[in-house]
């Protein structure tokens, strides 16, 4: 029969394994692990570039000051800087995004499957919110002004909307993953390739199939660049 000390040791080992399993991104085991995007090695993230080939440019991205176009249907542009743009972010568990909103523009309901987001308003006003998981689906929302900060928990559906019909808005978001991912809800549901059966969606949304067919025929705008 196993001794109490053996059970304690097993519990500690299981806790350590569980902690590693739920960690958002792999933690660094050295000063840095610049992503080698050309390596044939397949890992969760990227293999490390040989440190002797690393230079300051691997940790650098030119200024995000130019105002992107906001002429798409939703009236916003998300300029994401993640490990694909700054390879030095590999294993560091962070990325950043600038979001530009036209008057009455929005960053439509979406989720980041691998990251929590913290958003700061740089210019203008934003109405923001997130919805909790089933069964309550509670909406937490707030009107933010310049300098205000709001947090969107990992994996939850959230949005931002510029309520001003005359002035644009700008926000900066930090995300707790080198590659947070983004799933825009309408795009995923109505713009999937191949499309989800209209029988399934009609029952899910409790509408006529003709309504689903019309929605699936629309062009679902991608505002992430």
Swiss-Prot record:
GO CC terms in record: apoplast
Sites where the protein binds Mn(2+): 110, 112, 117, 158
Stored Gene3D superfamilies: Jelly Rolls
Domain Cupin type-1: 63-213
UniProt keyword Ion transport present: no
Family: Belongs to the germin family.
Entry function: Plays a role in broad-spectrum disease resistance. Probably has no oxalate oxidase activity even if the active site is conserved.
Record protein name field: Germin-like protein 8-7
Encoding gene, per UniProt annotation: GER6
